[in-house]
């Protein structure tokens, strides 16, 4: 998008919405290289407030959750840098909206509308999420990598903004070359690399069902689909041990634990749990009285009274 100017894209949006008000417009809010346009004219993420009809991919959430896409072994919130990314995670869970109670500069918070933030950790380019986690967690077990994958997905689906996943992400899609290396940008790779391995639907059914459950949770609880900054700023965040984060929506509590050890959370309330590290959905899993244990690299989503 950044190779085009703001005025041109705003004109395009107006004409498209005149034809069909339901058209959704989104793109990559960067230039992808050099650009002759002055920065203030570029249709890019830093100028998103001047492009109110366009959503843009949140590389803040992407790299904050899993580490930089430009360095295979770099880690993010779910795979090794929990404490130092906790404030960023609270910010992206707020849809990138600036908040006084979150330690992130207002200049880095690029939108006032959660609808503009496309939240993702995997797309067509760069390593798949599963391959990125395997590259950055070389000592981790298979179960630990899957837990990190599911935690990353939970952040995508339960953050304010627009969730986005890549085809096959829900079955731990990998793009593996014949030599065993992971392919970053597979636009010129053969079908053996790019094809979805449908046997993984069976092999990874537990992960797929977790993604399905997260989608159901997002649809069921309007607290994850807020439409304005004023509402989002009412979410109460608490930073916990090891960079864990609790988000209190008033009657609904989300706890995110990125650490490699369990976390005990006490609020003295009766909690009806809808999601943990194994299952997510709209039917209660169990009731906790006063306290709940959050598994390593897991979540707890609970209504409380």
Tell where the protein language model's regions lie, with residue ranges.
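General structural signal for secondary-structure boundaries
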Residues: 8, 54, 58, 227-231
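Short, glycine/charged-enriched secondary-structure capping and boundary segments
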Residues: 9-12, 39-42, 180-182, 268-269
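Carbohydrate-interacting/catalytic domains
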Residues: 145-146, 157, 162-165, 169-171, ...
